[in-house]
Amino acid sequence: MSVLKKISHFSQWILLYTLLAACSDKLSNPYPPGSFDHADQKLQASLDKQENTETAEGIILFVGDGMSIATVTASRIYAGQKAGQLGEEYQLSFEKFPYSGLSKTYNTNQQTPDSAGTMTAMMTGSKTKAGVISVNTLASRADPESCNGYHLKTLLETAEDQGWASGIVTTTSITHATPAATYAHSPERNWESDKDLSTQAKKKGCRDIASQLIEFDYGNGIEVILGGGRKHFLPESEKGERQDDRHLIQEWLAKNKQSSYVSSADELLNFDIKKTKYLLGLFSKSHLNYEADRVANNIDEPSLTTMVETALQLLQKHKRFLLIVESGRIDHAHHAGNAYRALEETIEFDKAIARANELIDTNKTLMVVTADHSHTMTIAGYPTRGNPILGFVKGNDSTGKSKDNLSLAADNQPYTTLSYANGAGHDNPEDDGQHTPLSYRSSPQKVGRHSTANDNPQAPNYRQEANVPFQSETHAGDDVAVYAQGPWAHLLTGVMEQNYIYHVMKHAGEL
């Protein structure tokens, strides 16, 4: 290409981008995203990529629970807009990873999956049914007869057996489906404590998930466990839910020498890391608070970023390590039809990934970022560039310029860019002050679209509109993205079955 043509392309894009970004921060990149030269620069970077075929000394799997591709896109725009940009051109840290692909998430018995079956696929290398934890597809859900003889060995168990250090970090209860699939085996994801076991299950010797974590006997044990769900580990006399009078936290401390237990953000920041080999942190009775609420209400719980940073500080004392990280409350916010909290959780998830990237040797650590399944949130409506992602749609006129007024649907009412195919937002998206995003409407009204004229779609408690009335919004069955960097990351490209991710991680670490 001639110099004059390059100058022409460059000048045209700078002029266009300057007009679009009139209300944004000044450009720091001489080749703005979307320009000819930016794409050419990207091509050169791709041509220069070298495949890393070294054995991984560390493996980190980041799982954004329910982090659909639409969630990633909306969070990217939201983060960019919070930074003063138009938003669409922004990149989350993991979107800069050199390799990416798509993961097919179905369970062996469901077109649209649940977290138990999908995480089992990533942790064991085999797909299974919905609702079961690291047992094979021959097991029957909630059947006590399936408690024994159907176990699938997990990557974490294999790593511990081969002398690796291991850690689990989550913003949900540590006994919830996704983290549980790393260490437990159960035909029922809801058997989190002995209280949840049926009489028949107890007779058959079925073990609750919390007790399986404490009794974990592979290698020298899991070094780092951080999350919520304290009630599953304590007897009723200690404000827990256990009916067998076991105090699992005390059992864990007695079992592991050089161990520390923490239950608040302050304690996590101040425990003696030099004298600690094993760390257990249970920061709430159930799930941790949403990140937005934690910050707004100054709650004494750690952020996901802080937990990941602490976990890596401990695990990197060892020659090789495996760390599993879940941002679990993205999923919960979507179930509640509350896009604001889903996006805030995703942004914190991205911050945790960025911090991990700063702490590790990226040439020796395989890092994989993905989701277990999708959700029904969509991005639609022809909004103009830079339109608030949580706001009502304002489109362009026939000349391509932004309109002064909001776009209206066929019923002459404004509509939001983000909406759900189903969920609690069907009858009245505006929170009435009596419902929190975790409290679903018990009986959504089957009524027509309500008036949106006085809605504030950017309010934290706003429930985006939903087409079909559900008490809780459902998962979706579309593929989710996989992002990877480090040793053997180039194997995670194209369209893959979800259980393939396990095989790449196992190969990368020679496990």
Model-based region annotation:
Residues 21-22:
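C-terminal motif of bacterial Sec signal peptides marking the signal peptidase cleavage site
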Residues 52-57, 67-73, 77-120, 176-511:
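A post-motif C-terminal structural segment
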Residues 48, 61, 104, 109, ...:
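Long, structured ligand/cofactor-binding scaffold of large enzymes
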Residues 2-14:
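Bacterial N-terminal signal peptides that target proteins for export
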Residues 27-71, 77:
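N-terminal module-boundary/linker segments of secreted carbohydrate-active enzymes
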Residues 126-211, 221:
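Extracytoplasmic mature domains of secreted/periplasmic and thylakoid-lumen proteins
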Residues 61-62, 168, 369:
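Structural beta-sheet core signal
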Residues 27-35, 134-142, 318-336:
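Short acidic, glycine-rich surface-loop motifs adjacent to enzyme active sites
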